[in-house]
Amino acid sequence: MKSLLDLFKQFTPDEHFDAIKIGMASPEKIRSWSFGEVKKPETINYRTFKPERDGLFCAKIFGPIKDYECLCGKYKRLKHRGVICEKCGVEVTQTKVRRERMGHIDLAAPCAHIWFLKSLPSRLGLVLDMTLRDIERVLYFEAYVVTDPGMTPLKKFGIMSEDDYDAKRKEYGDEFVAKMGAEGIKELLEGIDIEIEIEKLRGDLTGSEVKVKKNAKRLKVLEAFKKSGIKPEWMILEVLPVLPPDLRPLVPLDGGRFATSDLNDLYRRVINRNSRLRRLLELKAPEIIARNEKRMLQEAVDSLLDNGRRGKAMTGANKRALKSLADMIKGKSGRFRQNLLGKRVDYSGRSVITVGPTLKLHQCGLPKLMALELFKPFIFSRLEAMGIATTIKAAKKEVEAGTPVVWDILEEVIKEHPVMLNRAPTLHRLGIQAFEPILIEGKAIQLHPLVCAAFNADFDGDQMAVHVPLSVEAQLEARTLMLASNNVLFPASGEPSIVPSQDVVLGLYHATREKINGKGEGLVFADTGEVQRALDAGEAELHAKISVRLTEWTKDKATGEFVPETKLVDTTVGRALLSEILPKGLPFSNLNKALKKKEISKLINASFRKCGLKDTVVFADKLLQNGFRLATHAGFSVAIDDMLVPPQKAEILARAEAEVKEIEQQYVSGLVTAGERYNKVVDIWGKAGDDVSKVMMDQLKVQKTIDRNGKEVNEESFNAIYMMADSGARGSAAQIRQLAGMRGLMAKPDGSIIETPITANFREGLNVLQYFISTHGARKGLADTALKTANSGYLTRRLVDVTQDLVVTEDDCGTSNGSLMRAIVEGGEVIESLRDRILGRTAAEEVLHPETRAVLAQPGRMLDEDLIEELEAAGVDEVKVRTALTCETRYGLCAKCYGRDLGRGGLINLGEAVGVIAAQSIGEPGTQLTMRTFHIGGAASRAAVASSVEAKSNGIIGFNATMRYVTNTKGELVVIARSGEIIIQDEHGRERERHKVPYGATLTVKADQTIKAGTILANWDPLTRPIITEYAGTVKFENVEEGLTVAKQVDEVTGLSTLVVIDPKRRGSAKVVRPQVKLVDADGKEVKIPGTDHSVTIGFQVGALIQVRDGQEVGPGEVLARIPMEGQKTRDITGGLPRVAELFEARSPKDKGMLAEMTGTISFGKETKGKVRLQITDPDGKVWDELVPKEKNVLVHEGQVVNKGELIVDGPADPQDILRLLGIEELSRYIVDEVQDVYRLQGVKINDKHIEVIVRQMLRRVVVENPGESTYIAGEQVERSEILNTNEALQAEGKLPATYSNVLLGITKASLSTDSFISAASFQETTRVLTEAAIMGKRDELRGLKENVIVGRLIPAGTGLAYHQARKAKDAMDEAERRAIADAEAAELASAGTDDAAAEIDGSADTAD
């Protein structure tokens, strides 16, 4: 059998491999691959269409054209297999060998490989320590390189031009050797002794930074050559391999023309130039001609390998650049992404989808014709098994005839055989789900309405693809893991994904609303059956308030059985009838309310947590059926009269008009600037629009009705438009506002707001101008959507690439590290409760009761709903939980650190690809994020105008650690901290709210004061930023000179004058002096900061209005100057998608803020032109200083004490700084919070876990600081797991381990720097990745998912993980067995050997080895 397989040269499935290695091929290796040299550029004979001998398609070299038939036709058929025909020299074998047999071309002159020359950094340059420019000049015959200086003063590696060369020849004669072209470079490479070079470089890793960097780079490349055993001269080609002909085919078109692969053209050029050069060399042609031909050959080889990399790309007949070997593998349509990662699959079909309201959740409707085609193989085998057809051909005929028996068989085959439905774009794992097919007439696939949310599908012409899992294993996986009824939660947030929408919601909402004085109000019923009869008889209406006796099932804690319990409930007719579908164990109180979309979602969630998956799926299906039925019965209609325009609208508009007029007046008389006028006008109209919409909603919301006592009362409106918006079925308050309020402000395409609003609404109709303004912004929206989708897809691709190899590989890594979680409170509101943040995580340490100190949860315990309720009751306000970032698993993550699998509700399983899930969860809502946040005039500018802060709850006042304040002469407390916060705690010391207070605010409360809700905590002037003194004294101006550093401004209206600090860029002279104030005491001595010898110096920033006079007495807390807010440039907030990408790419923000490098005291040093020197002196006297541009806003002053990592210069923080100064946990918190802010704005829920997983991947490399006794180089980046393994090994041998520090890489960079070169090459920059990998002789251990997909194995995740682990265990056992046998044999031999030794004593010394 084995020999038979050998004959057919087929791979047996046992050929397992655990790694793939890449390297560089030596000339000998290339020749060993080859089956013969290609000598002629011809391809095929134009008359016979047979390949030319020795040509690019030669049958003698590459194999026969037809299976088992030689070219001349002498030998045909299988019996001559393996014979080589003596006439045409072709081996008789399968034609398939033409896909795998390579040829070669012997180059008449060596040529450099362009990848190693031009791919930056140039590897040739690094090895030779020459510049790329010089090497190019030598290679392309523009200069000579000295290969052997002999006794002359010339330097080896020296470059000389043609003229220099001639001069030196005259001077020194034949003393020295200098060469041109690749030969010269090759000789230099051969002369390099890598060992010696490495020794030299290792000793030379000192000196200037630039030199060290360069040496380290060179050292890395040389070490790579040494380690991989690759000789540097192999970077110069002597032999060129020729690709097998079937991979660069020549295809006849009709009309006698041929379509050919570009590679044939490129090879032809190489062969032509090569043979021409060979002829010239034989003829001993003049040097200059040969040289030119060599250069042409080098260029031809370059184009073949990577066309267009150097110089102009070679073009074909139609002026288009030819596609070279490099182009074949890189880019979206290259080998990696087109064929290895994105394959097309058989047994699939696609069609339009329609709604299938009668289906169960796990079913889909499959058109009969489609099913017949998809399930053909199963039908054929069934027909044969039943004896209806004897051959496949007969079965085919039978199926095509469409006999009744075929349809019966189809019904049989389809039973219990799930199919997979997929809707593009597949943004997360719920984009492919499995269903059981139900055969239907027609040609459209029917889809269950509840899964539309997961697929993001609607029925306006969407198409879906169907795939059939063939093998039993595939069917089993589809059934257990992918069936729609097993995927009811979103993996991103753990919320239910099978939530009804649109008409279902409307129907349920309408049926569960209550009406005052409805027919039948006050009746009491014995059971729901009676209610139904009353409704049918018209005695009670759907919304009437009634009482009814219901049976509730509660679970008995002891037995686990359900126990019935009846009680009388006040409800409405509609709700009572819906109660029949509640699953056992779900109390009626969940349903006894008007069911809006959110409520229904909560209902399904509660059902899933309390009653489990099966009951929930059945319940959801029943809800759906009822919703459709009720919506139909409700008979909704919308009329134009339902859009009620509020009567107060005219008055509000008139008031706004008047205010705008006033602003215009002020502008004309010069009181406000143009910018202020625009902002204020936009503000006024924004507010007017909000007011109109408020009175409109108030009017829509209620309707008058008569109660049973004949009194007129208000009840919630039954207005159709209002009900649609209120229930969450369709539309929103913003849309109703456009229908019945006013359209409001519109945006221009550049995002700025047009200051004249549209005062009309759609009911009144728009005039031409208003309509035109509307179209402006609407078109921008469409253009944006197209861009957004592409950007979002690219973000997802980068995220998937960086996390694709992160899989849960063990149960528990045993760490006790974690991160402290507490509720997120902003501006006094809880944005995210503690419950949301810790649900489904694992406790990292004991959770104690805050008062009794009793243990509420052990470390390692999963925090589920029940436990969290206990914690909330006990008043726990912070919990240390395990996170993905602190997990200590080497490869992958552990289940405990990850916590709950959000998509399934239990602890995560081993083998779950949590990295990909995280990437999809973050990328999938990407399309919903806005590209650019419109600076909505109304909301954005008004939010900034807060001028005080008030308490929202009762409690005790506290301040945060950085809060500092002084008491001024009036006895008020003035805040002088930049990041001060007021914290309000309840009597248990739990934080209730937290408010940021700006610098210069006046506090109206003291620490530990008990306050009531509504108390004003602090006031400040919102339009200016003050500069305040902390100490008392007399003002002494320095450098405050009118006309030089300050200018006098006279207010036109009041006639008062103030001094304004001029921008240094605008000053004529005195650019470097800084206007400032010193304080002097009564004796005229400068006031010093207590405890230091620094004088109190307060600098004025550009644009500051000086409020004091020279010589004026001031007290602490007094304002010296004010900076108008208008003068401050408002930072443009990047929002939406670009912000998320910026965070994950770890880019430094423009105008970034500066953090204190160490804890210490601030002082200002000597200033330079346009910059301020900022110094920090730590307690040990170490000084750190930095130059800060003058226009930056410095937040600290002379003598202030700052902590490491505190913001000292205003601006957005740089993640790199946060990591360096504050550590991993703080960085993770920063990125998680910032990303969540963007998503929260759009109302998207994503669990923090997913973002943490990505941050973990961004931190997976470390930079070596001190290599210790390892082989690393200082400054080298290595995988964290690798350095940990190395250090363990070093410590075991008692050697000095390497020290390292964390480094944060952006996601693109992190993907490219993974250990797997296959994964990196298939992502981006394929050429660079492969070049680097080849030199290093890299081994890809195939740990990630992507590498395994590319080599075509099961991925090591999910069911594949178990398969790979079992396989590796089996290999290890076989290996152990083999070793045991070998050892036994060796022992036998040894024992035999000792017998001989006894006989032959004098020979014993030799045999001892």
Curated annotation (Swiss-Prot):
Keywords in alphabetical order: DNA-directed RNA polymerase, Magnesium, Metal-binding, Nucleotidyltransferase, Transcription, Transferase, Zinc
GO CC terms: DNA-directed RNA polymerase complex
Gene3D superfamilies: 1.10.132.30, 1.10.150.390, 1.10.1790.20, 1.10.40.90, 2.40.40.20, 2.40.50.100, RNA polymerase II, clamp domain, RNA polymerase Rpb1, domain 3
Enzyme's top EC category: transferase
Binding site residues for Zn(2+) 2: C813, C887, C894, C897
Catalytic function, reaction form: RNA(n) + a ribonucleoside 5'-triphosphate = RNA(n+1) + diphosphate
Names of required cofactors: Mg(2+); Zn(2+)
SUPFAM superfamilies listed in its UniProt record: beta and beta-prime subunits of DNA dependent RNA-polymerase (SSF64484)
EC number per UniProt: 2.7.7.6
Binding-site positions, Mg(2+): D458, D460, D462
GO molecular function, one term: DNA binding
GO biological process, one term: DNA-templated transcription
Cofactor binding mode and count: Binds 1 Mg(2+) ion per subunit. Binds 2 Zn(2+) ions per subunit.
Keyword Isomerase: no
Binding site for Zn(2+) 1: C70, C72, C85, C88
A family per Pfam: RNA_pol_Rpb1_4
Signal peptide start and end residues: none
Subunit-level organization: The RNAP catalytic core consists of 2 alpha, 1 beta, 1 beta' and 1 omega subunit. When a sigma factor is associated with the core the holoenzyme is formed, which can initiate transcription.
HAMAP family the UniProt entry points to: RNApol_bact_RpoC (MF_01322)
Function: DNA-dependent RNA polymerase catalyzes the transcription of DNA into RNA using the four ribonucleoside triphosphates as substrates.
PANTHER family hit by this protein: DNA-DIRECTED RNA POLYMERASE, DNA-DIRECTED RNA POLYMERASE SUBUNIT BETA
Family the entry assigns: Belongs to the RNA polymerase beta' chain family.
The protein's name in its UniProt record: DNA-directed RNA polymerase subunit beta'
Organism name: Acidovorax ebreus (strain TPSY)
